[in-house]
Amino acid sequence: MNTMSHKFVLALDEGTTSARAILFDSDLNIVNIGQYEFPQYYPQPGYVEHDPEEIWEAQMLAVKKAISKIDAKQIVAIGITNQRETTVLWDAKSGKPVYNAIVWQDRRTSPITDWLKANYFKMIKDKTGLVPDPYFSASKIKWILDNVPNVREKAERGEIKFGTLDTYLIWRLTNGKAHVTDYSNASRTMLFNINKLECDREILELLKIPESILPEVKPSSEIYGYSEALGNLIPISGDAGDQQAALFGQVAFNVGEIKATYGTGSFILMNIGNNPIRSENLLTTIAWGLEKNKATYALEGSIFITGAAVQWFRDGLRAIDVSDEIEPLASNVEDNGGVYFVPAFVGLGAPYWDPYARGLIIGITRGTTKAHIARAILESMAYQTRDVIEVMQKESGISINSLKVDGGAAKDNLLMQFQADILGIKVIRPKVMETTSMGVAMLAGLGVGLWNSLEELRSIWKVDKEFIPSMSEEKRRALYSGWKEAVKRAMGWAKVVGGQV
């Protein structure tokens, strides 16, 4: 491995709880991984923050570990992927953050977005593809400008920079020489017009955000600057938000190709090509842009609770000791025994968008066992995925013939077979499951000519296992209709019992 003939790409994956660095070789094999956790801070209810300095330190430790077995001169490119929407403002001269990073999960800006929703919903959805929500960066920027002393005045004088975490890391890596982001991350700020591929002045004026604080928006694969942090100059040539990077890492380059990432929640993205199709129940977002003024778009559906339901089964009910025990337990029964589990712990996301829905286990009889409930929990992940995919097909007019999967639960063969059965399409699991990091490594390598085409990347990508549906159409219909009935009963429950949203 140490011979200088080997070329490597370094992917920085800046997540919500940890910073990771993954080193790939030119055949997209993983050579080494570094990972360091950093804390989240909760100064008040609904507030979620990071210290950007701690993120930087964790990211550099992860890099050091990932490249410990090679010479840094062998790294031909760096790619950066990140938790999206999380917002940092910093002093342009000193580089010091003016406030902690406000994380995507933070809900403090609800009053701002409620006002936007009431008065400007259609305009914002038409221009940005997003719905007014504290999730996105725009209201977080406004909050910092309005609430941190002197920051608005400094911003008006051009002394403040804004960035999502990709932008902040690129700024740090280049010693302040590059203030950039890519199309995919820009599309998550709620300030970017995804039709014109430029920042939207009407929304900026509405929120009183000075345009001078914004980074330059560039394609997802080009040289943005050179890292000076590893001892020699290395081009930073790939940038994408984590979910979009995973779509690219699944080589979903064609219209209608789709991926599901099963994590704490799940994210489902479908490539819809060069036309930003509008959806009633899903977000329209930019998947990536490989050249200036041209973007590939995606429909995105987010499911709030999938893997988190397994954690609840483990920690809340103490039904299992470790998460991996759920699959063998669920395998002890042939089917769910008529039991359905709706994991609406915090409401339901796409396509229901009901903050008042609450969790539900229904269909219990004297014959119900722990194994039936375990199976119902796993199956709920597959049902929710079908909910989103059905809406995607209906609203896009694009039919889907296979689903690519990644994330923790994608290792579970029982769940993946059930996913194929309930969808009636093939489910494909890749050999390398680190699709987010691999996607941005691909973008970075393309940006420096390590690979020359999407076809070349597709030929390197390898399948681990394909799951072929084997369930009858009649059984599929009956099971799914039971799920829809269970969801109906879960919806609005917090209103019935006067619970908090």
Curated annotation (Swiss-Prot):
Which superkingdom, per the lineage?
Archaea
Concerning InterPro entries, the annotation shows:
ATPase_NBD (IPR043129), Carb_kinase_FGGY (IPR000577), Carb_kinase_FGGY_CS (IPR018483), FGGY_C (IPR018485), FGGY_N (IPR018484), Glycerol_kin (IPR005999)
Supply the PROSITE patterns for this chain: FGGY_KINASES_1, FGGY_KINASES_2
Instruction: Note the SUPFAM superfamilies from the entry.
Output: Actin-like ATPase domain
Alphabetic keyword roster: ATP-binding, Glycerol metabolism, Kinase, Nucleotide-binding, Transferase
Pathway per its UniProt entry is: Polyol metabolism; glycerol degradation via glycerol kinase pathway; sn-glycerol 3-phosphate from glycerol: step 1/1
Q: What is its EC number?
A: 2.7.1.30
Origin organism of this chain? Answer: Saccharolobus solfataricus (strain ATCC 35092 / DSM 1617 / JCM 11322 / P2)
Q: Which residues bind ADP?
A: 16, 20, 264, 307, 408
Annotated residues for binding of glycerol? 84-85, 135, 242-243
Q: Which GO terms describe its molecular function?
A: ATP binding; glycerol kinase activity
Q: Which residues form the signal peptide?
A: none
Cellular component GO terms, alphabetically? cytosol
Keyword set includes Cell division: no
Q: Which positions in this protein are listed as binding sn-glycerol 3-phosphate?
A: 16, 84-85, 135, 242
Q: Which family does the record claim for this protein?
A: Belongs to the FGGY kinase family.
Q: Which reaction does it catalyse?
A: glycerol + ATP = sn-glycerol 3-phosphate + ADP + H(+)
Which PANTHER family does its entry note?
Answer: GLYCEROL KINASE, SUGAR KINASE
Organism placement in taxonomy: Archaea, Thermoproteota, Thermoprotei, Sulfolobales, Sulfolobaceae
Q: Name one GO biological process term.
A: glycerol catabolic process
The job of this chain, per UniProt, is described as: Key enzyme in the regulation of glycerol uptake and metabolism. Catalyzes the phosphorylation of glycerol to yield sn-glycerol 3-phosphate.
Q: What is this protein called?
A: Glycerol kinase 1
State if Metal-binding is listed as a keyword: no
